[in-house]
Amino acid sequence: MERLEIHSEYQRELLLSGLKHFFGDFNDKLLGRVLPRLEWLGAASGEIIFRQGEPGRDLYFVVSGRLRASVDDGLGGERVLGEILRGESVGEMSVVTGAPRMATITAVRSSVLVRFSRRQFQILLNEFPRISLRLMHLLIERLSRSGSIQSNRRRPENIVLLPISAGLDAEVLATQLGERLARFGRVRILTPGLAATLFGAAAMHSTREQTAEYLAMTRQLDELEGQHDFLLFVANREDCGWTRRCLNHADEVLLLASADEPPAPAPFETALATQDDGMSRAGRRLVLFHEAACLSPSATSAWLNARELIGHVHLRRNHAPDLDRLARIVSGNAVGLVMSGGGARGFAHLGVYRALVEAGIPIDYVGGTSMGAVIASLVALDIPPRAAIDSFREVFRVRPLSDFNAFPLVSLISGKRLEKLLGTAYARLIGESRDVEDCWKNFYCIASSYSYAREVVIHRGPLLKMLRASLSIPGFFPPVFHAGEALVDGAIFNNFPTDEMARIGVGRMIGVDLGDDNFGPVVGDEFPGAWALLRHWLLRWLPGRRDGLRVPLLGGMLFRAPMLYSKSRQKRSAEVVDLLIKPDLRAIGMLDWSALEQIVEIGYRHTRDQLQADKEPGFSPAARRLP
């Protein structure tokens, strides 16, 4: 990092705001002691501020820019914990406790920092002991958050639009996107022409060696950033000074591409992504444009394999809802929908989906487990609710679990019939088979690795195969072999995968929990004999006749037993959603495939009534602000 001898009055005001947040009440005497002890520093994009495991000698205040915290994942890579924004501090935990650094901190883009040494900080604490109370409060708050599921929601302030395909007008998209971002804050668009007018052509193309011009423009950009919630930089489709300047200030880069163009990166894109000055540290999101009549994207994997990305978005040209979705995603206001497993009860998700669409609630990300994954994929494919319901009504006239194995060495059911039913349904809706990453809306599902006893979060791969893996109940269906692993039902580890949606970082989350209640207590201390079991089973079919026994039968045991661990974490999973939808399906069995109409209607009516109610259990205040 380089020392900065000159800083603007605006940057000084930003620092004072951060100091007040950190120290609490701030008087002139305390300010007079602090300011002379501070060191102003400039960090380039990609520069490491400190590394995990190093001794904690200093703490830092972010005056402008953005930092990223990450830890070693134990597999040779890194796991991102979050980002430190303007006005926030980093490093205080190690400075106070003397413990090694808990994470590696890297500058996402060009940043201005202020450093406060541990020695100077301790002198200040001795002189103003009341600071300790404020600091203790901040540390306790941070530690309390570390033990719970946290949303990785991030709101980029500087967004760069970089066209990588010829023929795309980035300025038009910036205007369209800016109009939609204005719903969430103040927006300023910086095109090459406007930048030349504001800063001068020489400053636009200045490099770090041209210190005066470079820093002057940096300060001007900092002030613009402070006056707006979003800066949209329109970069050139070439490796030039303006494009590099845009990338140096980027919190996120949108790579704009035409889906009908070759997916291989152009030379200028490769040069910008691999340069040594760290401009590639900002997250890059691929935005693929499709023709308006496109039924479903295809071959997305070729684009993703060629780039290191934080995500991708499919857009249909001149399709306003897709542009609305992009604006919600990049502004941190995306809406996520999570659907739990539940066997035949999963048809209720179709009714929930219909009610959400009728209420005008948009869905930007969707995920699920087992049967929830199947319905979630229909949402992700942008299949209208009525079309999805009609297709499943037709297909599931055939019982999906009736193809028993003559020699059940691996499973009771071969699974071929269910595979054929799903294939028929999806062929009617979208034509040929697709991959997970080809869905219009970003989709994930959960499977369990029988090979390595771990949860598998699936964001890519053949769609139907991945759905089969997510609902392959051990003992009922054979495992699905994929990438060297035997995959089985995701409900074993995570039947209600809200934690993955939180990791994605949506602004609002809707969760649909179809998990049944606990089995409950049994009567007596001995398991009943054969005659008592037979009598119990026969009485179940006679109206009004019960014998008082509570016995788990084979079908229920095979369904429920593998999900006991997942069920133990279901309550915690429900705590992170903004809107919890939990239809009453106790009268429906998990194998009642013939009750599709009834199940769909229960899901629809429950969701419709819940959305219309003023006060409803599970309907949190945050959900009232769903876009």
Predicted regions and their residues:
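Cytosolic regulatory regions built on CNB/CRP/Popeye-like sensor folds
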Residues: 1-171, 183
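Gly/Ala-rich beta-loop-alpha elbow adjacent to hydrolase catalytic centers
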Residues: 368, 372
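Walker A (P-loop) phosphate-binding motif
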Residues: 152-195, 335-341
